[in-house]
Amino acid sequence: DWGGLIGLRIAAEHEDRFKRILAANTFLPTGDYRSPDAFIEWQQFSQKTPVFKVGEIITSACVSDLSDDIRKAYDAPFPGEEYKAGARRFPMLVPIKPDDPASNPNRKAWEVLKKWDKPFLTAFSDSDPITRGGDAYFHKLIPGTKGQAHTTIIGAGHFLQEDKGEELAELTVDFINNNPVT
């Protein structure tokens, strides 16, 4: 789930290792602009809820109903609450203020991404309250988005791989095929 927040910085820091990027339901905030209320609520929930039910959290961010087996699979790595410290901490690593620790590294990444002319595709969903519409920011700032087949995936929440995995896979394959490495 942290592919954009981690992956976009890695791509910016190691441009030579990346030939194309597909960004889905993500953002790379610097804390310079107000975060969506839904994200602030998520941060607060992650810190205050006494029981952090990972499978239920994933399910709540999906449009489709996940099977009990899938929910259990998301819970499986965490045999007890004490094993969820990292999962609880991750939301707090996202900068929401200009002086947060990740703000400057994200700003540096944006300086690279604003010059990124390699293929860059966005595939956002229509039902993610945190990232919905965020693709427009990428389109405006990243030159590599020009001429790509950007899409809004209908009927999907935050976890595209769960709600519309096959559609996302097809988009990915098409993106790779339409932008061969030279």
Predicted regions and their residues:
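Catalytic histidine-centered segment of alpha/beta-hydrolase-like enzymes
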Residues: 156-169
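Flexible "cap/lid" subdomain of the alpha/beta-hydrolase fold that forms the substrate-access gate
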Residues: 2-152, 161, 173, 179-180
